[in-house]
Amino acid sequence: MKVAKLRVAFLVDGYLAYIQKFMLAYTYIEKGKFALVEKQKPTLIEPTDAIVRVTMGSICTSDLHIKHGSVPRAVPGITVGHEMVGVVEEIGSEVTNIKPGDRVTVNVETFCGECFFCRNGYVNNCTDPNGGWALGCRIDGGQTEYVRVPLANQGLNRIPDSVTDEQALLVGDVLATGFWAARISEIAEDDTVLIIGAGPTGICTLLCVMLHKPKRIIVCEKSEERRRFVQEHYPDVLLTTPEACKEFVVDNSAHGGADRVLEVAGADDTFRLAWECARPNAIVTVVALYDQPQVLPLPDMYGKNLTFKTGGVDGCDCEEVLRLIEQGKIDTTPLITHRFPLSEIEEAYRIFENKLDGVIKVAII
């Protein structure tokens, strides 16, 4: 009897040791294939690292780009996912901005804060080996239970006590993207702003454009379901379809086109639509990530004197975005239409990738 009890105790202890060491992680296997596999839990490598226990994550369209082979830098074998919030479990000796137990957002962009580009505010071009989009692309990301965050002093922001995980979930990527895009578009109060695309990033961009209080906002979206979502939640926004967009924008703007165009759709024909809908001397901000190369037909657009702006999400704004959420000025919780446990992430991806069941954003809990 004692031997049997000892054997059971040994097995239990062994199992506990095993589960303390391993975790489930959704992993990029090869082009076209992700899989949920067991991996060792991460440990600190550099003194600037932090270990975060993921409490909620999400699926981004960029994850689909990795799956389809459209992100050459993506490394097979990495855990995917770069949209997450969590609790700090452990910090390196040089991490001073956060402490164990803090609830934090995780920035999609990691940056050193010291190189030429960081010092000049272009943190998405950070030259550190872990700089730029590393998490869930070049190093293990957050569609898992624990994640190692390099350069944690810059990459983590403490979530205010009054802000929930759901409210903060999109801060580190799509909301920061929309905030950056609206900022660099130089929106004035007399402007007509056209946003092409009403997916998750498009709606986050819309929310951030609304902070600038332009005279008129037009959203162009092909999906009737998503147009209905925008109409229900943001009734002052004008809506159109890609087929009717050019004529609609001309009819609803003062100078023959939109003053500011933000291209967030990333479809085959939306880049051309963006500059065609812009008035002369307008700013066109390209937010989208494309699967295919785009053509810049300079002879066709020469006389329009357009300014194009593009680039990666700016990781400097997350603290300000959290403050705006705390103040009730930004609310992305209506975008979270579906919730799945990590064990059902394959189903979550199926629904998100195929745009089923009215999905906007999926939370992995």
Predicted regions and their residues:
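Glycine-rich cofactor phosphate-binding loops and adjacent beta1-alpha1 units
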Residues: 185, 227-307
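Glycine-rich beta-strand-centered segment in the early N-terminal region that forms part
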Residues: 42-57, 70-119, 160-163
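Local beta-strand N-terminus motif with an aromatic residue
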Residues: 101, 190, 235-236, 257-258, ...
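Cysteine-cluster motifs in flexible loop/terminal segments that predominantly coordinate metals
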Residues: 60, 108-157, 161
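C-terminal hydrophobic helical "lid"/dimerization subdomain
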Residues: 18-23, 222, 247, 272-276, ...
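Short, flexible surface segments
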Residues: 97-100, 189, 280
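Mid-domain Rossmann-like dinucleotide-binding core that forms the NAD(H)/NADP(H) cofactor-binding site
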Residues: 158-243
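Positively charged N-terminal leader segments that act as targeting/secretion signals
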Residues: 1-12
